[in-house]
Structure formats: C-alpha cells, structure tokens
Amino acid sequence: MKLILENVEKSFDEKQVIKGASFEFESGNIYGLLGRNGAGKTTLFNVINEDLTLDSGSVKLSDEGGERAIDSDDIGYVLSTPIVPDFLTGRELIKFFKDINMKKIPDMKSEDEYFDMVDIAVEDRDRLIKDYSHGMKNKMMMLLTIISNPAIWLLDEPLTSFDVVVADEMKELLKKLKRDRLIIFSTHIMELALSLCDKIVLLKDGKLRLLEQGEMSREEFEAYIIKVLKDETEGE
C-alpha cells in the first residue's frame, strides 16, 4: 500500500505553506517527518486527513485495487494535544470505541488487554479521563488508533509528553505495529526520529524530500540533516 501525494499546495491568505509537495509513502515503514518550526508539518497532516482543503494537487491511496481517494476510515490521527471526552472513564471510552469498530476488527481484545498494551495502570482504568495527565490522555489517543486499526497513522509529536521510560515503551510498540501499516511520525526531536523511524523525510520550503543515511554514521547523518535544514539554498 502507498500514500501518494502529487503536487500538493496549501496557502493561508498570502502565505503559501505547502508548495507542490510530492512523495510516496509505503506501508511497513515508520517515516520521520522533520522540519523547522512553522515548516508546515501539522498543515500537511491536516491536508492528508482532509481537515483542510487542498488548493491544488492530490492525495491518494494505492492498494491492491489500484489508486483511490482516501476514506476517513483509512487514517488515524494522533494530535500533539490530545482530544478525548473528559466525562468518560478510560474503560468507558475503550468499550465505546470497541463497539463502533466491532465489524472491522476480527481479533478484538478485552478492555484490559488494550490497557496493558500501553501500560495504563489498573487503578487508572476506571477513573474519569478529566483526571488523567497529559501523557495518559496521549496514551488513550494512541490506544484508540490501535483499536480502530487504520492503514495510515499520522502521529503529530505524540511522545513529547511522555517520560523517558514510557516514550521508549511506546517506540517499541510502534515498531511492532508497523507491519501492514504506514506510520508518519512528526517530530522536532532528532534523536527520537533517528531511533524510531525507518526513513527520514524533510519538509522544507514547502516540499518533501527523502534523506538517506547511506554510508554515513548516525552522527554524520544527524549533522547532515541539520545542515540541510539550516541551508536555505540547499537543493534549489
């Protein structure tokens, strides 16, 4: 399966943020989307998720049936600021999400099995979500994505609110889940991108570009990425 972006453009008033971006993302990979602050990473995610309308270009999915438009069921979008219903308990939310996704998930697990996947403590599972920490709410967002099982995951800096141990646990979980899925992970933390992602994609000057490590060491590759991000004339 591929997510195909062709000449995608998006502007706000007089400012063009995405400038003819084209790229093919393939399933089975975790892509690290890097870019400087204001580069348009969240805008790109919102365009893919159809929260924003394209000015021009196309976003398509290519699978065994050929190319087609993206359906809302294809995408799971985890925002940097979690949006979850505070008036429910964690268990109530998981049960509700299981119920509405029952038909498309053949191997549905119990609520506690899902909680175990993201290491939410037993004593927190029946608490109101309004009493959860920011990191716990982010865990719930990740869990809802796991349950709904979309083909494409858009993760907008979801690990930045976790402590070091939990972030490492979530990284290992994502690595296990990437098979048959396409995960695009937006972050500004270089170490996180290099330790988690299979491929690094830069969003710079409104366009997407794959950076390949080749024979470079990790330190050399990191220095190269920083150089490209800083160099306003690179590739022009």
Residue ranges and their predicted role:
Residues Y31-R36:
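The feature captures the beta-strand-to-loop junction immediately N-terminal to the Walker
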Residues V164-V166:
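Helix N-cap at the start of a conserved alpha-helix in ABC-type nucleotide-binding domains
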